[in-house]
Regions:
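Acidic-enriched, low-complexity/disordered segments with a strong bias for Aspartate over Glutamate
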Residues: 34-36, 55, 74, 85, ...
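Terminal connector regions
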Residues: 129, 159, 164-200
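Hydrophobic beta-strand positions in extracellular immunoglobulin-like domains
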Residues: 119-121, 135, 182
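Generic structural motif
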Residues: 106-108, 131-133, 178
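Substrate-binding clefts and catalytic carboxylate motifs of secreted carbohydrate-active enzymes
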Residues: 1-127
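Intrinsically disordered, low-complexity Pro/Gly/Ser/Thr-rich segments with frequent PxxP/GP/PP motifs
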Residues: 131-174
């Protein structure tokens, strides 16, 4: 199989889309070794892209009051951008959406050596929250750790911590990542992680 084969291109309704997919794969990942890997990585990339948008919109509650993505499912067997295929199987985006659309969610945004750790509470009650923020290296050693206790008001989002980690990261930017463990008052936990460089 080949993404540029006549059969694959007949399913692609945007003439420049396959090139864009390959471009963004090359910006973020190493090039996949075969067609199956290419399909898989393109689905992971789709999930990461949609997550980035949703996280941004949730962090800007008040300016943006909701988000939907196109499209949920397929009505016939086809190669598509749907998050659930015709047979009801979840693709990477749908697994990711179940987490990033959770009523109580956390997210990390990185730029350079800076990280913004945020939380959203879409419930109708204020929620107390503990967030343990760590900078880890690829061997999982903890280089930095801080726990923040806060409350996220009902139907709101907050920045829990904003910090430039240049002093922690030093010259190891490609070998470290930010991690945030969110523990809500009802015991619900989730972990978010984000690198400071593209995944490749």
């Amino acid at each position: 199989c080949n993404i540029f084969s006549p059969v694959m291109e007949s399913h692609q309704k945007n003439g420049t889309a396959n090139g864009k997919i390959l471009y963004y794969i090359s910006e973020n990942f190493r090039y996949p070794k075969d067609f199956d890997s290419l399909v898989y990585v393109s689905q992971v990339l789709q999930g990461i892209a949609i997550k980035a948008g949703v996280d941004h919109w949730r962090a800007n509650r008040g300016r943006c009051m909701g988000a939907l993505y196109w499209q949920l499912n397929d009505n016939w067997p086809v190669a598509s951008w749907a998050s659930i295929d015709y047979f009801g199987r979840w693709k990477a985006l749908h697994y990711m959406a179940a987490r990033f659309f959770a009523p109580k969610a956390g997210y990390i945004y990185t730029e350079g050596t800076k990280a913004v750790i945020s939380a959203a509470n879409e419930t109708l009650e204020n929620q107390s929250l503990n967030v343990t923020v760590r900078i880890r290296d690829v061997e999982l050693n903890v280089l930095f750790e801080e726990t923040v206790e806060t409350t996220v008001k009902a139907q709101s989002s907050i920045h829990v911590l904003e910090r430039d980690f240049a002093d922690v990261i030093g010259s190891k930017k490609r070998r470290v990542f930010a991690e945030a463990v969110y523990t809500w008052q009802d015991g619900t936990t989730s972990t978010e992680a984000e690198s400071f460089v593209p995944y490749k």
